[in-house]
Amino acid sequence: METSTSFWSTLDSWRARRAAVFGKWFMIYFWTQIFMIILAFLSSLRLVNGMPADLLVLLSYGYSVTEVVIFYQLGRQEDRFKTSAGLALIALVAGIIIQLLHSEVLAGLWRIPGRIINLIALYHFMIGCAEILLTTDGKLSDKWRSLWKWYIDLRVGAIVGIPVFLIVANIFKSILVVNLGVILMIGIAIALIVVAILWLVYLYRTARCFQQIGKTLESSPGSDAN
């Protein structure tokens, strides 16, 4: 009986530590995303044009380094995040090398592989979120999977649809075709904005979910998480 009690106490302690790690780093990642959105917004309003270009580059790489660290910390608990960390690190190192060499040729050659690597890293992150939530919040887990499907469909739609539209518009030179293409692009842009908002909402909810689980397990009788 004592052995059984000790086993469940140890299991709860492990689950509490795991939840605490997820709660902490998902919340850090959420606020990191908010910071980058604010920076991008200010940049679009030309409010940061007075800042040195090198500082903006440094902030961008600082974000990338932070992202690698976050993925690594999450990866210590779940392998999919470890994969995301490795891919993000590859993208970061490649970006630094290209920046140091000031090579437009390398930048052009890296553009497509870089996007593919980022897409795969994002896949492992989002599916990783779905998997770790499967036994704690099934609805949120399903939402992460749906969000990935929406995102990849929209990205493929943008990559394939826009070139096809340009070719068709060039062939037929029709105002109707042009208008339909513009509507298509606006629709995709709006949908991607919605996906980005949902990404932030799900990220915050995931962080809060694990923070609550960690607190519950730490305060439960027999837990030695503290």
Regions found by a protein language model. Give the residues of each.
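Membrane-interface extramembranous regions at the lipid-water interface
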Residues: 1-43, 60-101, 113-164, 195-226
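Membrane-helix interface and helix-disruption motif detector
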Residues: 40-59, 100-119, 169-188
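Small-residue-rich transmembrane alpha-helices that serve as helix-helix interface/gating elements
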Residues: 183-199
